[in-house]
Amino acid sequence: MAAAAPGNGRASAPRLLLLFLVPLLWAPAAVRAGPDEDLSHRNKEPPAPAQQLQPQPVAVQGPEPARVEKIFTPAAPVHTNKEDPATQTNLGFIHAFVAAISVIIVSELGDKTFFIAAIMAMRYNRLTVLAGAMLALGLMTCLSVLFGYATTVIPRVYTYYVSTVLFAIFGIRMLREGLKMSPDEGQEELEEVQAELKKKDEEFQRTKLLNGPGDVETGTSITVPQKKWLHFISPIFVQALTLTFLAEWGDRSQLTTIVLAAREDPYGVAVGGTVGHCLCTGLAVIGGRMIAQKISVRTVTIIGGIVFLAFAFSALFISPDSGF
């Protein structure tokens, strides 16, 4: 028993060593595994913010150009800016046309040129009288528009307000004249024009007698085309042209056309003025005496003064740079 005890003690010693060594060997492995797992976990956590931060610059840089495009694309209304001048031009033309035609109508109805065309149309060929009067009025309108357009070298602000003052002066004068007129003012104007035309006819007949006999007595022959040409360029045509041009020169309608061309679209003023003269002269040629008896020159003059004052008053609400 005593001999076997040492053998058993020797045999149990290695077992005890193994029992002690295995935990010792396992402990470092566990210790190594634990920190490695913790470190791996810790290493995995920090990259997560890094991975989240790395795409952020890309995400920020990516949407920024899109945002810039969204901001700048609607802020460049190229088409609207191109269309605005054309729209303003059309409105300016219409405004000038309406202003010119309305002012010419209220200025020319019952005027001296109106009665000249009316009386000559009752005595001579209407088409010849209308052609001569319209040529004179067309030339006068074009000259007046050129005079008014020449003032555009002056800044528009000055011409705009000067023309406004002139409109107010014309309106006040027309109102005063209309209120002071007698109801028979149109008949007096008509008789005055008749006397003037009678005087012109007497001078024409006297000149014709002084020039000698006609073509038949001299033996000269005139072909048919020459007769047509002489019929168109007849003394009546020349008389209507000269009388209308001289009566219109310095008249209120000429001054009004100059003032309108200085502040409005010149093309609109030219077209509107020509159409207004054509309407008034056409009425005078077709039924001038009847119209002169039906309408009152006093009423037309008062209405004209109101129209002029309305244009002057509108300047208080329209900017000079608006194009109207």
Curated annotation (Swiss-Prot):
GO MF, one annotated term: calcium ion transmembrane transporter activity
PROSITE patterns in the record: UPF0016
Bias type Basic and acidic residues, positions: 35-45
Entries under InterPro entries matching the protein: GDT1-like (IPR001727), GDT1-like_CS (IPR049555)
Coiled coil: 184-211
Gene Ontology cellular component list: cis-Golgi network membrane; endosome membrane; Golgi apparatus; Golgi membrane; intracellular membrane-bounded organelle; lysosomal membrane; trans-Golgi network membrane
Residues exposed to the Cytoplasmic side: 111-126, 173-228, 289-299
Reactions that this protein is recorded to catalyse: Ca(2+)(in) + n H(+)(out) = Ca(2+)(out) + n H(+)(in); Mn(2+)(in) + n H(+)(out) = Mn(2+)(out) + n H(+)(in)
Major localisation: Golgi
Reported impact of R126H: In CDG2K; alters subcellular location; does not affect the affinity for Ca(2+) and Mn(2+) ions
Residue intervals annotated with topology Lumenal: 34-89, 148-151, 250-267, 321-324
Keywords: Antiport, Coiled coil, Congenital disorder of glycosylation, Disease variant, Golgi apparatus, Membrane, Signal, Transmembrane, Transmembrane helix, Transport
Secretion signal span: 1-33
Expression sites by tissue: Ubiquitously expressed.
Compositional bias annotation for Low complexity: 50-59
Domain of life assignment: Eukaryota
Annotated transmembrane regions: 90-110, 127-147, 152-172, 229-249, 268-288, 300-320
Illness association: Congenital disorder of glycosylation 2K: An autosomal recessive disorder with a variable phenotype. Affected individuals show psychomotor retardation and growth retardation, and most have short stature. Other features include dysmorphism, hypotonia, eye abnormalities, acquired microcephaly, hepatomegaly, and skeletal dysplasia. Congenital disorders of glycosylation are caused by a defect in glycoprotein biosynthesis and characterized by under-glycosylated serum glycoproteins and a wide variety of clinical features.
Function statement: Putative divalent cation:proton antiporter that exchanges calcium or manganese ions for protons across the Golgi membrane. Mediates the reversible transport of calcium or manganese to the Golgi lumen driven by the proton gradient and possibly the membrane potential generated by V-ATPase. Provides calcium or manganese cofactors to resident Golgi enzymes and contributes to the maintenance of an acidic luminal Golgi pH required for proper functioning of the secretory pathway. Promotes Ca(2+) storage within the Golgi lumen of the mammary epithelial cells to be then secreted into milk.
Protein name: Putative divalent cation/proton antiporter TMEM165
Name of the coding gene: TMEM165
